[in-house]
Curated annotation (Swiss-Prot):
Source organism: Blochmanniella floridana
One Pfam family recorded for the sequence: ABC_tran
Keywords: ATP-binding, Cell inner membrane, Cell membrane, Membrane, Nucleotide-binding, Translocase, Transport
General function of this protein: Part of the ABC transporter complex LolCDE involved in the translocation of mature outer membrane-directed lipoproteins, from the inner membrane to the periplasmic chaperone, LolA. Responsible for the formation of the LolA-lipoprotein complex in an ATP-dependent manner.
Enzyme Commission code(s) on record: 7.6.2.-
GO CC annotation terms, alphabetical: plasma membrane
Family: Belongs to the ABC transporter superfamily. Lipoprotein translocase (TC 3.A.1.125) family.
Keyword Membrane attached: yes
Name of the protein: Lipoprotein-releasing system ATP-binding protein LolD
Membrane topology: Peripheral membrane protein
Keyword Translocase: yes
Annotated SUPFAM superfamilies: P-loop containing nucleoside triphosphate hydrolases
Record's subcellular location: Cell inner membrane
Lineage: Bacteria, Pseudomonadati, Pseudomonadota, Gammaproteobacteria, Enterobacterales
Record-level Gene Ontology MF annotations: ATP binding; ATP hydrolysis activity
Amino acid sequence: MVNKNINDIPPILCCSNIIKRYQYSNFSITVLDGITMSIEYNKIIAIIGASGSGKSTLLHIMGGLDKPTSGDVFLEGRALNKLSDKDCSIMRNTSIGFIYQFHHLLPDFSVLENIAMPLLIKGLKFAIAKHKAQFILELIGLNNLCDRYPCELSGGESQRVAVARAIINNPPLVLADEPTGNLDESNSNNVFKLLEKINLWYGTTFVIATHDLSLAKKCHKIYIVSNGMLKISTI
Ligand SMILES: Nc1ncnc2c1ncn2[C@@H]1O[C@H](COP(=O)(O)OP(=O)(O)OP(=O)(O)O)[C@@H](O)[C@H]1O
C-alpha cells in the first residue's frame, strides 16, 4: 500500500501568472500583474487590499466568471480558463459556490426556493431539491425562515440564506466577495461562524475577498493584493 503524504495532495485551486488588463477607449490598466498562488483544500483564505486593487477581479477569474488576459486558473487540476463556456458553466455549477456582498437573492422566490434554485437549475425534481434545501436550512438553524421572501429578512439573515444557497450543491470551493460587507459586527461574526462550521463539517474551502481585517485575521491565511501583485500577510 502506498502511504500518501499530506503534501502530495494537489491544491484545489492554482493561479499561474494571472495578468488582467482592462482596455478603455484611449488607455488600459493592468489590474492583476502576474498573480501566482495555490489554495489548499479545507482552508479559509482571505484576500484583502485597497478598494480597486483587484480583489473582485481575481475572485471572478478564479470562479471562471471572467477570463484572464493571460495565465491559467486550475480548479482541481483542470484549466478553467481553457474550457468552453458550456463546460466552464458545468464546472462552476458543480464545483464552485458564490456568495456576494448584497446576497443577490431572487426577490420573487421564498427562502426555500432561493436555496433550492441551484439544484433546480441542475435539473433536480422540485420535491428532491425542496427536501435538500429544508435539510440545509435545519442544519444551519434557519428553518423558521423557509417561507419568507427576501424583502422580509434582515441583512444578516439574507446573508446566511445566501451562504446556504452557495453550499446546497456541496461544492468543494466557495468564493465569497465581501460576504460581510454590509453587516454590523455581530452579524458579521455570525456569518463567519457559519462559514467556519461548514468548513469543519464538509471541508469546504472558502476564498473571501474582504475589507474587514478582523474577519481576515480569523482565516487560515491572508493574501494582500497591491499594485497588481499578491503577497502573503504576516499579520
Ligand atoms: N468589467 C470591468 N471593466 C473595466 N474595468 C473594470 C471592470 N471591473 C473592474 N474594473 C476596474 O478594475 C479595477 C479593480 O476592480 P475590482 O472590482 O476588482 O477591485 P476591488 O479590489 O474588488 O475593489 P472594491 O474593494 O472596491 O470592491 C478597478 O480600477 C475597476 O475600476
